[in-house]
Structure formats: C-alpha cells, structure tokens
C-alpha cells in the first residue's frame, strides 16, 4: 500500500507569488544613464562616412523587426545627445519615454511593456581608430620646402573679370596653396575659385606674330581644370 505527501494549495500559491515578485523586481531594475561614453575599437579602420552609413542603416531597419517606433525615435535622439555630451538631455529623453535602463546604458533597455531594445556601440560613440575625412578645401597642405631650396617666380593669374593678378609661385606649390594666396590678395574665398590652365600646341611657338590662324588656334589650344592638390607644370604656365 503506497502513500503520498501533499502540499497545501495556499503555500504553493504563495511560493509562486514570491518567485514572480522577485522576477518582476529584477526586470524592473532601473539605473540612471551613465555619463561615460563607451570606448571601442573597430575590427578595421573606419572612416567618418562609413560610420554614418552604418548608423543610418541601423536606424532605418531596427524598427522593422521589433519594438515600437516612438521608442526607437526616443532612443535615437538620446544616442545623439550622448555623443554630443549632453547627458541631461539624454536622461530627460529616456525618462520622458519611460525607458528602463537595467545597467545605466542604452546598449540594453526596456519600454513600459517589457520589450527589450539593444543599441550597438557604434551608435553611441565613434571607434578609437576612426579615420577623419577631409573635404576638398580643408586639411593641412603638404609641408613646404625650406626657403633656401624654394625657387620662386611671379605667376600671372587672370580673373574672370579680366583683371590680372601676380602671385609668388614655385615649382612645388599646389593649387590649394595658390588659392589661399589669391584669397589673401583679392579676398576671393578658396571654395569659390576655379582654376584652369591654358595649353597651346607646340607648333604655335614657331609662328611669327600676326600669322596666327584664328580657326586653327581654336583647334590647337584648350583649357584644363585643376584640382586642389594639382601641382602645376610650370613649363606650360605663364611666367612673368
């Protein structure tokens, strides 16, 4: 004859209630947003443009998989505030959206319904091995040679207004350097300058003055645009 041991129903319910309460307590843990931004290193050197593209891809696709769009929008705004070192604004956004941070970081957070949201670290801070890109007109020009090795001459530059300007040039000068020099003389911003060089066919050098054929001149000469880092072929440029 066998026997069994029973457990009072009330005690079982109390035990389940305590376990459920402990679980809700752990899930409801919330800490203030930490001020320290995460430090991380990319697997490969990443440019600023690549980082922006990676972030845009995440923010465009994340709401399509899980969570509510308004929470994603709040997290995006908070992430921008964190990167801008505006900790108070980021905390206000998190609190206003009722977002819970169990570890005080946006890498893991929950909304009011208990839905989990995770932000990759690259959305919160750039990598330590980020490569900064420079625009066409920004950045540092190449170091100039020592004055005793720099051979200068005067270069005539004709503006679109027809005015001729004389600049001090050398064989190693770049267009970026000459643009800055023209800006100092005429006040024309480098970003508004467009430089062109005029080439002529070699047989024109042997023509006597007044013997030029206008039709042939149009066929044997042309203008070529110059970029910021172009070094002039001064043998074809007009020297004074």
Curated annotation (Swiss-Prot):
Region named Disordered: 1-48
InterPro entries to which the protein is assigned, alphabetical: DC-UbP/UBTD2_N, DC-UbP/UBTD2_N_sf, Ubiquitin-like_dom, Ubiquitin-like_domsf, UBTD1/2
Domain Ubiquitin-like: 153-228
Low complexity composition-biased segments: 12-22
Domain of life: Eukaryota
Biased composition, class Basic and acidic residues, residue ranges: 28-42
Protein purpose: May be involved in the regulation of cellular senescence through a positive feedback loop with TP53.
Name of protein: Ubiquitin domain-containing protein 1
Organism: Xenopus tropicalis
């Amino acid at each position: 004859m066998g026997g069994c041991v029973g457990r009072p129903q009330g005690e079982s319910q109390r035990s389940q209630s305590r376990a459920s309460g402990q679980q809700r307590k752990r899930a409801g843990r919330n800490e203030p947003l930490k001020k320290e931004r995460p430090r991380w290193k990319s697997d490969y050197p990443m440019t600023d443009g690549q980082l922006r593209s990676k972030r845009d891809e995440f923010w465009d696709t994340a709401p399509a998989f899980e969570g509510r769009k308004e929470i994603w929008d709040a997290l995006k705004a908070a992430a921008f505030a964190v990167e801008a070192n505006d900790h108070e604004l980021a905390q206000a956004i998190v609190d206003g959206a009722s977002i819970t941070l169990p570890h005080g970081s946006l890498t893991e957070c929950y909304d009011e319904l208990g839905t989990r949201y995770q932000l990759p670290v690259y959305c919160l801070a750039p990598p330590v091995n980020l490569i900064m890109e420079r625009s066409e007109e920004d950045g540092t020009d190449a170091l100039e040679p020592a004055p005793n090795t720099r051979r200068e001459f005067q270069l005539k530059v004709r503006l679109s207004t027809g005015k001729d300007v004389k600049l001090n040039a050398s064989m190693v000068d770049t267009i970026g350097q000459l643009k800055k020099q023209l800006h100092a003389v005429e006040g024309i911003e480098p970003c508004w300058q467009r430089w062109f060089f005029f080439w002529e066919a070699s047989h024109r050098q042997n023509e006597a003055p007044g013997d030029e054929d206008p039709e042939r001149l149009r066929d044997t000469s042309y203008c070529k645009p110059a970029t910021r880092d172009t070094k002039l072929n001064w043998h074809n440029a007009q020297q004074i």
